[in-house]
Amino acid sequence: MTKFVFVTGGVVSSLGKGIAAASLAAILESRGLKVTLLKLDPYINVDPGTMSPFQHGEVFVTEDGAETDLDLGHYERFVSAKMRKSNNFTTGQIYESVIRKERRGEYLGKTVQVIPHITNEIQAFVERGAAASHDGKADVALVEIGGTVGDIESLPFLEAARQMSLRMGRNHCAFVHLTLVPFIASAGELKTKPTQHSVQKLREIGISPTALLCRADRPIPDDERAKISLFANIPQDAVISVWDADSIYKIPQMLNEQGLDRLICEELRLDPKPADLSMWQKLVNAQENPEHEITIGMVGKYVDLTESYKSLIEALRHAGMHTATRVNIEYIDSEELESGHLEVLAPLDAILVPGGFGKRGTEGKIRAIQYARENKIPYLGICLGMQLAVIEFARHLAGMTDANSTEFNLETEHPVVALITEWVDREGKVEQRSADSDLGGTMRLGAQRVPVKEGTKAATIYGAEVNERHRHRYEVNNHYVPTLEKAGMVISARTPTENLPEMMELPESMHPWFVGVQFHPEFTSTPRDGHPLFKAYVEAALASQQRKGA
């Protein structure tokens, strides 16, 4: 039977519950246990797909096409299990499911209430999500409950967790509570009172934490840990100090050294082999002792909120670990490039335009792409970044001066990028969309296998086939592909059924390394293995740096 570890947060949000849960899962996996993770989000949105990146940060896309919380990206980077749609659900999905059941008459005329109907549905979703991994044979499922203890939105989830613990019995559920111990500069000391109140609030709900993870900007002294232990009624060895680290990949070792995995295994009556964190130590060592250093310019419109590009930033770091390179990222606001200021691009070793939506800032991105092409700076375009590379090429090399995407200009004379209205999804089903379709859940989503053209950079990087995840509505217009190819562009990968361009590149006679991809490779990069495309991109940046210095 799968055992559960519920991870909750107190005092404030953004303490890093997702990284804490993923780190604990990584330690348990290193002990030979089969682990999976779930994220429960208390907002009423069905999923984060239509939420602003400023509100929510990145939307992480799973292999089966779910638009999910960015914490699922952390989960996949820390453990070997692949996340699915069932690994993330929201209050909106729970209420939607309960209301559908009520309309079908499944409650037999009963008054439908938060308790027991909503809490029962939450428990069913949790158990179904845990059963989706490892053929239903996961040893431990870590369940992160979003929000903060005390928020009205989180109460049904916490109550469901309490009921699960009661129903399953002792030694089948554990609770890890993440809380803040702030340092007050004027007093020159750490304050434990917020943590005491947070634990008290949790105990009022009926939950006593197995372990307390105390977040601070510095290690918490033993006397403060003893004080927290006394007032929170938790053994002192279960009060874990989690201080700010310069790399999230140091957290598994930090938690293991303080015995968190031992506490959880004892609580759940598990007796696995000792933890082996040598892989994590090796990765941290590679990160801290690089042989090279490069600077990549990321040109976007959400650059003030880097959470919007979380998986992409981590993918570049992974590539750095696997090429002995420190990768510095310069965030460049594309709107500032629209009025000039291209001189900020000159010192860069490579330029990257990530995915995005909407017209704002696109002309600045196109100017950055033109600069990269004309100055032979390695370029990687992802999703929108590929579409804009096609537009730039069409305007300046293929004679279509007003080329554009119908996303930005419906009246353009040359719609080289247009709305995709019909395609075959990963399960072979025909999907159809129009400009009037709902925004939520109507994109081309999830992983798809695509053959690669021989003799291209894409083939050198990927081999014969690409299997990557998508999240987009617009595609390169096949009508213009012959004209683009005649001007020198290489379409190096196409979908097998609709023949839609998936990868484009420029031949070496035109540019040393210029690649665009319609998919999102950052979602499949892990610190363990890196990603072939990002490794090739970093290597191209290193080569460019050497050419400049020669």
From Swiss-Prot:
Domain Glutamine amidotransferase type-1: from-to ranges: 295-547
Positions of ATP binding: S14, L15, G16, K17, G18, I19, D71
Designated name of the protein: CTP synthase
Protein family according to the UniProt entry: Belongs to the CTP synthase family.
Signal peptide (residue range): none
Residues annotated to bind Mg(2+): D71, E144
Subunit: Homotetramer.
Region (Amidoligase domain) location: 1-270
Record has Calcium as a keyword: no
Binding site for UTP: S13, K191, T192, K193, P194, T195, Q196, K227
InterPro entries: Class_I_gatase-like, CTP_synthase, CTP_synthase_N, GATASE, GATase1_CTP_Synthase, P-loop_NTPase
Known role: Catalyzes the ATP-dependent amination of UTP to CTP with either L-glutamine or ammonia as the source of nitrogen. Regulates intracellular CTP levels through interactions with the four ribonucleotide triphosphates.
UniProt-annotated binding residues for L-glutamine: G356, L384, G385, M386, Q387, E407, R473
Catalytic center residues: C383, H520, E522
Enzyme class: ligase
PANTHER family linked: CTP SYNTHASE (PTHR11550), CTP SYNTHASE-RELATED (PTHR11550:SF0)
Remarks, miscellaneous: CTPSs have evolved a hybrid strategy for distinguishing between UTP and CTP. The overlapping regions of the product feedback inhibitory and substrate sites recognize a common feature in both compounds, the triphosphate moiety. To differentiate isosteric substrate and product pyrimidine rings, an additional pocket far from the expected kinase/ligase catalytic site, specifically recognizes the cytosine and ribose portions of the product inhibitor.
Pfam entry (one): GATase
Taxonomic lineage from the root: Bacteria, Pseudomonadati, Pseudomonadota, Betaproteobacteria, Burkholderiales
Protein species of origin: Cupriavidus necator (strain ATCC 17699 / DSM 428 / KCTC 22496 / NCIMB 10442 / H16 / Stanier 337) (Ralstonia eutropha)
GO biological process, one term: pyrimidine nucleobase biosynthetic process
